[in-house]
Amino acid sequence: MTACAIESETAGAAATVSPVSGEAGKAGEAEGSGGREEPEEPERPEAARGPEGTWGPYEPAKSQRVVDPLAPDESGAPGGGVRAAARAAAFTIAADGSYAARLTLSATADAAAWFPERWTLDGHEPYAVPLPLDQPEEPGSDVLPLADGRVLIRRQVADRHTFSLLYPTGPGTGELPLGALECADGTHLTLLPPSPDGASAYALSIGEHSTTVWLVAGGAFGPVHVADVPGRCSGGVWLDRAGRLLALDREPVGGGPVKAVAVDLGRGGEVTPLLQIASDSNDRLLLADADSGLLLIRSDAPGHDRLGWGVLGSCLPVRFPECLRPADVAVTPFAVQPGQMLMPESCAVALRIDGAAGSWVGVWRPTGRRLHQLAAPEGWLAGSGLWTRDGVLKLPYANADVPCGVALVEAPVDEERGAGPAWATATESGMQPSAAATPPAVCKPVPLGQAPLVGRTAPG
């Protein structure tokens, strides 16, 4: 574990990025096995090839017309009367990219109703399977796909949260109840991102003074208490491929700056510091890639909120690239290219760019130091997508013509650093250095008793 200086002209602060323990790292090598029967699949619908190499499958029946809740109405506002619900209708992709799930609207008998919808993404063409039950769902419910094709749904009635698994059963939908949790007044419960093992699902119960991690799917009997973390936590990023190391953004009890911490679920919720850029800065972890160790960070250490990157377990400084702060837009990363072992600077990162004109896609690599801005497909489910190991970005979308489609975008090629005319006109082309050149950082050892995680040697 080492503490390193961040490049002074960019942030002027010290940064600490902690390595993971060796034991946990070994656990990350093994893939979890579900050990369950595959749920019954309906007959695969016939698909039709769409434009630009995308695929659009079946047309939904008129009796169950799919309505995109994010599509603007005549007033230009999303969702035509369901604006608040549309914001909550997230599109969640399983950790292995095989399935996705969302809540969507159907119009049946002149009445709009919410129902879960599962997308299959790992075949030759994507297709969607509706999972409606006898009663419509509340727009505030959450859905999360598992790697075996079942979909977890969280419902709330007053202070009681119930969990069930939904799966297709021919023409209908099967439901397996998993149990419920009751939360006290002022306690907020939310699902964490899909676990890397594909068979488990976790939730955060956020109270006034502490946060509880629950295993809500994959346990023996109902929700299982996993860990208590002092303080109010948010976010949630998996740091390994075994679903053991979880990063949370924690606000200390009594207030103070928000810092990312690592929670070891295999050690009863042992909490250790993960990010420490400045003593009074808010340092949040947005994304992490287990293969390369690339971290995407948002911090106000430079004086205001900036998007930066670092490497887990490295003594290299955290950098805040100028190209990731374009004017008058908000930039949020949502996917990192996997499979780039020990090459974090070569990872392609997909970003959602929100501006007055709407939402579109950005692609950036640390080594390229340039933000490529690309048009999104019509009906893009903004902020969702995944990379293949070969550098192809898959962007799910749904519109009136294609109710379930995936656009394929190859990552733009960056000019080689230090070569070609593009680097001679870097300012004009928008290619700006991440930070000013500085001497190599001098790493200061931390006493063993203060090291947050042990057993792994920091690369570099």
Question: Model-flagged regions — what are they?
Answer:
Residues 108-119, 158-167, 200, 208-214, ...:
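Structural motif
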Residues 103-106, 296-306, 312, 320-368:
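Loop/turn-rich, solvent-exposed surfaces of beta-rich toroidal or solenoidal domains
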Residues 73-83, 125-135, 172-184, 221-228, ...:
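A short beta-strand motif characteristic of beta-propeller blades
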